[in-house]
Amino acid sequence: MKLKTCITSLALLEGLVCISAQNAKIIPANTIAITPTDSKELIIEKAAHVIPTKNQLDALRNEFIAFIHFGPNTFTHMEWGNGMEDPKIFDLKELDTDQWCKSLKDAGMKMVILTVKHHDGFVLWQSRYTDHGIMSTNFRNGKGDILRDLSKSCQKYGLKLGLYLSPADLYQIENPKGLYGNLSQYTKRTIPREVPGRPFSNKTKFEFEVDDYNEYFLNQLFEILTEYGPIHEVWFDGAHPKTKGGQKYNYEAWKKLIHTLAPKAVIFGQGDVRWCGNEAGVTRKTEWNVLPFNNKDLTEITGLTDWEEDNIGRRDRLYDAHFLHYQQAEVDTSIREGWFYRDDVYQKVRSADDVFDIYERSVGGNSTFILNVPPNREGKFSDQDVKVLAETGKRIKETYSKDLLQGAKGSKQVLDHNDITYSLLSNNQLIVESKLPITINRIVLQEAVSTHGERVESHAVDAWIGGKWKEIAAATNIGYKRILRFSEVTTRKIRLRVLQDRGSVAISSIAAYYYKMRPPQLTILQDKTGKVSIDEKKQPFDWKNQDKKDIKDKDKDFNIYYTTDGSEPGINSLKYNGPFEKEQGTIKAVAILKGEPGAVQTEVVGIAKNKWKLSESKDGTKNHSAEAAFDANPKTFWQSTNQNIPQSLSLDLGALYTLTGMAYTPQTAFGGGMMAKGIVEISADGKKWETASAFEFGNLVNDPSKRDLYFKQAVKARYVRVTAQEVAGNSQALTIAELDFF
């Protein structure tokens, strides 16, 4: 049968290849179609020929990039605004984008993405098409332009610039004259719309058949893509706090404009780059970037019902696809609890240990790491954040700037630190030998994804120790990059073995490094009786990369010290020897290894729950009784049988306490029933109630982390009633994994 190929022009793609012959030569492409007659073997062969575009490859090479969330939420202490905030709430006096960029550069980042418009519709640049933004604030007498400042600082510090422009727009929804969902007709419109006195230096014109809101969005895209220097990523969030009027987005028009005005930009959420499935920095054991899709728009991953599912590119899913397409993941999380800055007292900041760990798991797991660093109300990064960024960058540089295989004997194509050159493996093995013995605990592998795609499905690495090969690490796929972590070994020879593949394997790089072990991160837990335990944090990944017993004996001879009064712990503090009793206090703990302190872990502990009981009976679904909401086990949860709102849970704490706040832990079994908004009421006798505080927890579905609520003033109570007035997610039946009162 003769080879039959067809190239279809699709927005966002650099080629759609269709192969009809079972034995035809497959041309590498960004997207390859599957036909009904394709065998499973041919489908896997096609998958092995799916490659990134040049823009995608450049984005992969960025590896570590920054998010900056800044806007009215910074001043209202909220995660999501409502769109009706007075712009003057954004009460910025000073702005230091040079400090931002220097800090990000010190961390080893290569690009920064700014939320120029979040869901509230407030814009951070001098737009011609709205007055809901920086132009209506007192910042620089209404003449300030945060995007302009950041663009200049990026150029100064050699950082690429990306833009987050939320398709959702609560201002355009809530404003009586708003354009979102106003049921306007689709008519031919010229982009950009001319505004008297504000001409564009870029004279490019577009004609699209769109409605009012799509025109508004396109006009704003035109502004930010033509007046602020080169743009390398455009980020379209999929979150929608609210919709109206059946508003649809004309993504094809948006993409055409972006491809024309920002030809080097990748687009998040529309074919180029995708979400990793969580906002907590959790990475998959296996992260394929060659994915199965149902449609040409590349919006429906075959078989995917939940973005948090594991291994979304596995073989059995490929067999059911209509298209195979390269779409890389970004692992996005925040350096702080929440996307926006709230305060420097209660809002916790990730340690450098934590950030460096996520860096190795994401960049070393075939993904890009995007870390949010939110500026404070003084227009700067807080000191805590800057210190963490500097320490993270120091560790990255100390660990990965010197390849210990430099000058080693082996294929020069895998030792030249060039991800374009490669070596095709013979017998699926590769051996390199150093001139002298080297001590290592990191191996970095890369496939030649730009020419040969992703082919390794599982692999192992051996070291020559004591006259024989010893396996020191193993994992699943490799892709753009895989970082293997293991206990330190000293060797001269390293062997890569590919155990399963999708075709002839092309390795572009193998490198070896040494990471100086630090004291571990800690976790602080309180049980139902009030006893507090402190232990090493369990890492959220499961690579076959470390012999736990060996590490415990060799590398982890550390002690834990703690305080119970909120003061900083050190070697002169209480030494942890086992669980201790503590109610209503702030525990701070640190591990010290060979005189070096690790990151300080802080946890506010509440009232012991062994005397708590329901003051009003509440039904729960099977295996999810109301008592699970206060059993000191965040893995269990109460799920109400009632789907009506409001819903409440009333508790008898067993005695009269002075309370300063509450903590709510959402369940993580599914994305629904989360307590987004409500009130906390207190009572001394269970009959007469008064409100202690209202609460609103944003972004729970994407980030179901523990949320703290501090009352404006301390209250005395024996009885507490928590009422949910709004529930987030795909189920209205209220769920609570844990309630704490402190």
Model-derived features: positions:
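Bacterial Sec-dependent N-terminal signal peptides
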Residues: 1-25
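Ser/Thr-glycine-rich phosphate-binding loops at phosphate-binding pockets of nucleotides
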Residues: 113-116, 598, 682-683
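Aromatic, loop-rich ligand-recognition surfaces of beta-strand-rich domains
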Residues: 380, 384, 388-391, 399, ...
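Short beta-strand segments within Ig-like beta-sandwich modules, predominantly Fibronectin type-III
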Residues: 473-477, 568-576, 699-700
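Short, compositionally stereotyped local motifs that mark structural "simplifiers"
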Residues: 515-648
